[in-house]
Amino acid sequence: MHLDHHHESAAAVSADARRPDGSRRALRIGLGGPVGSGKTATVAALCRALRAELSLAVVTNDIYTREDAEFLLREAVLPPERITAVETGACPHTAIRDDISANLEAVEDLEDEVGPLDLVLVESGGDNLTATFSRGLVDAQVFVIDVAGGDDIPRKGGPGVATADLLIVNKTDLAPYVGSDLARMAADAKAARGELPVVLQSLRGEDGVREVADWVRERIAAWTA
């Protein structure tokens, strides 16, 4: 389920789009959102959906552990050399917005060690509704919320909800059990975001990530055009 409106602008260039050897670097997409909203599950589903057609890698962020990276490794969504972790040691937004050096180094190391990449997914540690990525780190941002957090979250807004290039309302299958009104969430998201796209998804089905994967494909096409 999704709102049928799209934002067609090409992916913004966050930094030099060329590597030192002159080749085009990978498109970088950041995924942020509150703790437990389903960021890692979405990353895993995207890897499964795209790994046959794109050369991709993942950088995860946790404060003191490698928990999210270890989950992806256990799920075998990508070969181990394509998954790396940053231990931020501080609030998650610091490493994706204020001091992006560790994440930039992780991304560049992946490109050096794995070879040419089409896409790098950078997953933030769980944060609040104000979390945003530096455009020096990523070219596009996805923000993930879930219905269990309350159907008033889109109305409350915040930079993540209002300005991310894509908003995902996740775990729609739980709506009947937690009393969330999906139509209200969709309408509030549209009011907060205007023409920016929104996807309502449940990853319980095999094609649950299809719309988000299609959005990523559009960004890749714009990046390589």
UniProtKB/Swiss-Prot annotation:
Pfam families registered for this protein in UniProt:
cobW (PF02492)
Location in or out of the cell:
Cytoplasm
Enumerate the InterPro entries for this protein.
Answer: CobW/HypB/UreG_nucleotide-bd, P-loop_NTPase, UreG
Which top-level group of life is the source organism from?
Answer: Bacteria
Positions that bind GTP: G33, P34, V35, G36, S37, G38, K39, T40
Enumerate the Gene3D superfamilies for this protein.
P-loop containing nucleotide triphosphate hydrolases (3.40.50.300)
Record-level GO BP terms: urea catabolic process
Q: Where is this region: Disordered?
A: 1-21
Keywords of this entry: Chaperone, Cytoplasm, GTP-binding, Nickel insertion, Nucleotide-binding
Which GO CC terms are listed, alphabetically? cytoplasm
Q: Which GO terms describe its molecular function?
A: GTP binding; GTPase activity; nickel cation binding
Q: Which family does it belong to?
A: Belongs to the SIMIBI class G3E GTPase family. UreG subfamily.
Q: Which PANTHER family match?
A: UREASE ACCESSORY PROTEIN G
Q: How does it assemble?
A: Homodimer. UreD, UreF and UreG form a complex that acts as a GTP-hydrolysis-dependent molecular chaperone, activating the urease apoprotein by helping to assemble the nickel containing metallocenter of UreC. The UreE protein probably delivers the nickel.
Summarizing the function annotation, the protein's role is:
Facilitates the functional incorporation of the urease nickel metallocenter. This process requires GTP hydrolysis, probably effectuated by UreG.
Record-given protein name:
Urease accessory protein UreG
Provenance organism: Streptomyces coelicolor (strain ATCC BAA-471 / A3(2) / M145)
The encoding gene: ureG
